């Protein structure tokens, strides 16, 4: 393990250049270390500890070694100069809040075959200039507040493997288009709250739960299409300016009437097309 004590005791060399042979970068190793503007990780590095580089101000993207398995909680949080992150294919776990409040971060990329299956809680929370995210093909869960208040986030792929989108996961993001994956089961409370650029969203038939306020505050959302009956639909999932497209007599139809939402029936739409 390379620790803060190792760094203090080193003689010569650049701050942030970790000697070969170390597999673990210790918790808080470089916490708020103003001398570190670039980090060079050894090829043997497998784990980056909690808060290891929190508060450092890297001017270059970190070159992660292939073989890195885990980046722990808040490892790179509050780095206000970092612009791009590219993760290695070997990465299996990315800790909560790992890049929280990296407010100049613009691009995040995972290799398609990355082993990372969970996008952890608040991992990119308040990365206010993040515009583009490429998630790995194995992603299954996007946890609570993963992209909370990423207000410039316009482009993100949601792989077909995603089955759960957590509470406030995309709160106040800027996507204009949203293609929900066909195996999605859960849309959490306020998952897309205040995504003000969305205009139309189709809910796949795999979805069993839509949490309250899921699409509330999406002021430009004109249509939300739900052609099946989810097991659970929370209150006020949309604004009253939005139209619910559903099947006549369905649970969704009754839900729309209960909340006074405008409703359009898919059967009538088809009849008009045929006519």
State where each predicted segment sits:
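Structural signature of tandem-repeat unit edges
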Residues: 1-2, 9-24, 34-47, 57-70, ...
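Consensus positions within tandem repeat domains that build extended binding/scaffold surfaces
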Residues: 27-29, 49-52, 73-75, 95-98, ...
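A short alpha-helix capping/helix-coil boundary motif
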Residues: 5-6, 53, 99, 124, ...
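Short acidic DE-rich linear segments
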Residues: 273-275
